[in-house]
Regions:
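PAPS-dependent sulfotransferase catalytic core
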Residues: 1-116
Length: 116
């Protein structure tokens, strides 16, 4: 992929996959049972045809979408590494919500550090 600093399109599905793969060194995005590739293509078409993104807006969305694909790669890798976790029931999930800069990240990390 050639870098174009003035690029106004966000990217193609294949370019985003290649970028995410290069970043983390993984290439298994899992099955496409949820049709995420098609949905990603629709989103990219909308960015290109409807959103009127600036060059900066395109870069920001490219970065955001690549991050989502990296998360998918890491998640798939973890499911493959620990397949027994599929059978673990989550009985009482905890949702941490709040406004920006109110300590939700700190609370989330604190809860995540609990060995129980």
């Amino acid at each position: 992929m050639t870098r174009r600093p003035d690029r106004k399109d966000v990217a193609t599905v294949d370019e985003l996959h290649a970028s995410a793969t290069k970043l983390v060194g993984l290439d298994d995005f899992g099955t496409d049972d949820d049709n995420y590739r098609e949905a990603l293509g629709v989103l990219l078409d909308a960015y290109q045809g409807e959103a009127g993104l600036t060059v900066l807006g395109s870069k920001m969305n490219r970065f955001f979408l690549r991050g989502a694909l990296v998360a998918r790669l890491l998640s798939q890798s973890a499911w493959k590494q620990y397949p027994e976790h599929v059978d673990v029931a989550i009985k009482r999930p905890i949702f941490v919500t709040g406004l920006v800069r109110t300590g939700t990240t700190a609370l989330h990390r604190l809860l995540g550090a609990d060995p129980a």
